[in-house]
Each structure stands twice: as C-alpha cells, then as structure tokens.
Amino acid sequence: RILAFGGKEGEIGAEEFARLAERKNDSYVEMIAAITPDDVFPGILALLEALQAAGKKIALASASKNGPFLLEKMGLTRFFGAIADPGAVAHSKPAPDIFLAAAKGVGTDIRACLGIEDALAGVQAIKAAGALPVGVGRAQDLGDDIAIVAGTAELTLAYLEEVWRQAQR
C-alpha cells in the first residue's frame, strides 16, 4: 500500500522489498534497544497489576515481531500468560487471526475477551474475532461504535469492567 501511495508500485521487486523491510526493522530494533521500564505508557503498569490481582488472563496480540522484546525491556513480560506470534498466523490485522491465537494461548474463548487497540485495523480484527474492542485514541480514527479512551492513563480495571457490563446488556 505504501508503494502504491508513493507511486512506486511495481518498481520494487519482492526481494528488494523484503530487504528494505528487514533494514527498517533492524533500525527499529536498534532504536528500541534503549527502552526501559520508564517508557511504559501512563497507567499501563497499574492496569496490568490490577488485572493480574483480579485473576484476569492477559495476552499480547501485536502484529510486531518485536512485541516480546519490548515487553522484556519494559519489565512487563511477567504479566502475560501468552504472547501470540504474528509470524505464525495466516493473516495480519484486520483479520482476526492474531487475536484468536492470543485467546487460545491463554485458554479462553474469544467471546469472553476484551481487546485494547490504538489502530483501526486492530479494532476491526478484534470485532472480526468476536471479542469486545476498547480503543485508545480518537473516535474519528477508530470508529464511534466502541468504547474509547483518549489515553492509556484512562484504562483501569474498573473502566474495563464497566465497558464489559455495558456490552452485555
């Protein structure tokens, strides 16, 4: 899509595209190597602690193959019962595959899951999977038919439980 948008579709072959994608990822990995627990988004540590204390199962459904590395760098791995491997699913977001894999990883029916996303493709994937989406961002970017918070600091166990209750009506 990026090549088409830039008017370069068909100018770069599959091998060159793969090489450039790998180079981009290598640069990204170098950049994220400096990440520490201080880089955890506001409210996320408290949310993970509250979810864990309440006995909730937590899984990561990231399209990034760097997800496990980032969790480790931020000291968050201990909270996750499963980390879905984006390389092991047939289709990426907006297909539901990664969310279905995450739910399976923690042994939970996807219909009993709530997914938190900051991108439209992720929200679409959560819906397609049959889980309940909660967006982080703006309604004009994520859709106006889901619960949305402006920032991660607003994500609390109480808020998520209320969103779940409202959706079950």
Identify what each model region corresponds to.
Residues 1-12, 70, 103:
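Helix-loop "lid/cap" segments that line or gate small-molecule binding pockets
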Residues 3-7, 33, 75-76, 153:
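A generic structural signal for secondary-structure junctions
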Residues 5-42:
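Metal-dependent phosphoesterase signature
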Residues 11-14, 38, 61, 74, ...:
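Non-catalytic, surface-exposed connector residues within folded enzymatic/regulatory domains
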Residues 30-60:
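Short, acidic loop-to-helix structural element flanking the phosphoryl-transfer center
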Residues 45-56, 64-169:
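Asp-based, Mg2+/Mn2+-dependent phosphohydrolase catalytic module
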